[in-house]
Amino acid sequence: IFFTKNGRKMITAALICYYGMGWGFVQICEFFLGHDWRGLLNDIVKQQNPIANMFISSFVGASEQNTAGCKQAADDALKLFAANEKIKNALRKSASYEQSISPATLETNSVYIYIPDEKLKIYGDLLRIITAQSMEYFSSRPPEHKKMILFCLDEFASFGKLQITEALRKLRK
């Protein structure tokens, strides 16, 4: 749990730092995986983003072995998003002239995502993100948005653990 929790701090710091510089998610993941923990943390600090630096301040003076373990846990979580070409293409930062999907797209469009059973192991992390972000969007919809949204998940149990309890609590009936 220690490595996972602190690895998430590194990821959060990188996302805040580099997204604020205009980078896309895939570019951030590739940069993250392309650097050791020392190079990554030094580069984040060099950007002088105070919010990003708050997330990594706990690594100052920490054991190098523990910090490397945290980075490895984070690398394991991000590998799919930096190495799989189909995922990279789906999640890349869209050009301004390209259509893209956001949770708000669900207000006016039908979106179908089909993943064959044999690919669930590979794309499970992506499906968990899509599900969690959609649920978060549903729970924060403004009250004036009255149109009902039907959200169906086939084989929900095969997704594994989803962190959606908080979003479900906030959903309107």
Regions flagged by a language model, labelled:
Residues 1-173:
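P-loop NTPase motor domains
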